[in-house]
Amino acid sequence: PELGRYCADWPVAPRIVALAPARQVLLSSAHVPAGQQRYVKQALPFLIEEKLAEDIEDVHIAMGPVAREQPVPVAVVRHLEIIAWLDALYTAGLPPASLIPEPLALPWREGQISVAIAGDCCLIRAGQWRGLGCDRDNVLTALSTLARQCQDDGGAAPAIAIYCPEEEEPAAWGRCLQQQHAAADYAGEVAVHEREGGPLAVLGPQLVGEAPADRIDLLQGGYGSDRSAGARRFNWR
């Protein structure tokens, strides 16, 4: 609420970008049959239903750009989750212009896996549209699995970039991962980036300015915003 009141005093309303918790969002993709791109919105629920643990009626599906002969990137979240987030944001006086899954706010480049150590939860981005959240006890295993998957898909061994605050002993994380790589005869490089501040020190820079092409905004469909005349009225209620 305090932040909402602070923003209300600005002469120009700020553009608010909210982050959706990684563990509550499934980032996946769907292969659309040739010639069916125009019907992709209608087809998506049927194309990804087998990947879900929930009933398709209980989830919201947001999609990324549709490219010819390419899988369609999607983000899936339970309706109950996104409604709770929007309720909290509006109650605090912070109507969001965008709602982005946390992993897609990590810095990333081709041939790299990025991971941010943030307390008990770690964020991983393993591709333009791939990412997840996991607990810190499983992050090294998850990184090794994702790196091997990249190689199995025909790519080179990806470099791994670790973003870690000083109190998390970044050098120790780097050594553990390098030892694991050596034991598995893995050739990918490991780079450790010590950062100050919380997770937003890593995620924040990617959220500034216009939304790049490698984000999926969850505010689509029934959760989309009416931005006409500067309005931020959401239709999800």
Task: Cite the ranges covered by each PLM segment.
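Hydrophobic/aromatic-enriched cytosolic interaction surfaces used to assemble or bind macromolecules
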Residues: P1-R237
